[in-house]
Amino acid sequence: MSKATYKERAATHPSPVAAKLFNIMHEKQTNLCASLDVRTTKELLELVEALGPKICLLKTHVDILTDFSMEGTVKPLKALSAKYNFLLFEDRKFADIGNTVKLQYSAGVYRIAEWADITNAHGVVGPGIVSGLKQAAEEVTKEPRGLLMLAELSCKGSLATGEYTKGTVDIAKSDKDFVIGFIAQRDMGGRDEGYDWLIMTPGVGLDDKGDALGQQYRTVDDVVSTGSDIIIVGRGLFAKGRDAKVEGERYRKAGWEAYLRRCGQQN
């Protein structure tokens, strides 16, 4: 588990995307990623307007939106990301052969590679998924892109454990510049081999313990103390009538204080 500061890690990271993200985290004093699964662009943009100042990263599932368009959804999202200084992460969870994911990432309705700074993929199909996605990014844009591998999940009964997790970590080692880290519940090591992987952890909640569909929540302190660099919070920010601005600051503060404790800068 890294005890270096985000600023220190930004200065030495081989990935431009990861370095930019670490710098944003340092400058805004936040390690909060907002996961906003809503059905309309209007709802999405309203929540982003409220949460933008508190987050380092926005995680989307644009295939949930009933009215998605590049002009009506992506353009204003990119404007908000510039206004409030956060990156965009499309939680696509690619899981197919290299040529197929290359097309899914670059083409179709969503053209993810054009606008999302970060996306993610399962390791189930092997290292070809990394090379396919990287090729797509290089062909579509000159902007740097980053990939997260799904090493562990937060849902009850997940099969992403043990040898599967180990195999996914091995796949991540195939490309130090493009693969920037993992969706995981804990530190994934690698520093002794020269890797500085970002760990992003979903299933973080200060109030709820889970839901009826198998989601299991862990506290902010728990995930950060076991190696998470970025806490991913969804319904805890806006569901059940919650005030997104209030909850955004609450989670930002909790995440930042947990990070300072991990780095030895706060008791």
UniProtKB/Swiss-Prot annotation:
Changing D91A: Reduces activity over 100000-fold. GO terms for molecular function: orotidine-5'-phosphate decarboxylase activity. Substrate binds at residues 37, 59-61, 91-100, 217, 235. There is a cross-link at K93, K209, K253 (Glycyl lysine isopeptide (Lys-Gly) (interchain with G-Cter in ubiquitin)). The active site is at K93. It catalyses: orotidine 5'-phosphate + H(+) = UMP + CO2. Its EC number is 4.1.1.23. GO terms for biological process: 'de novo' pyrimidine nucleobase biosynthetic process; 'de novo' UMP biosynthetic process; UMP biosynthetic process. SUPFAM superfamilies: Ribulose-phoshate binding barrel. It holds the Pfam family OMPdecase. Keywords: Acetylation, Decarboxylase, Isopeptide bond, Lyase, Pyrimidine biosynthesis, Ubl conjugation. Disulfide bonds: none annotated. It comes from the Eukaryota. Pathway: Pyrimidine metabolism; UMP biosynthesis via de novo pathway; UMP from orotate: step 2/2. Belongs to the OMP decarboxylase family. This is Orotidine 5'-phosphate decarboxylase. It comes from Saccharomyces cerevisiae (strain ATCC 204508 / S288c) (Baker's yeast).
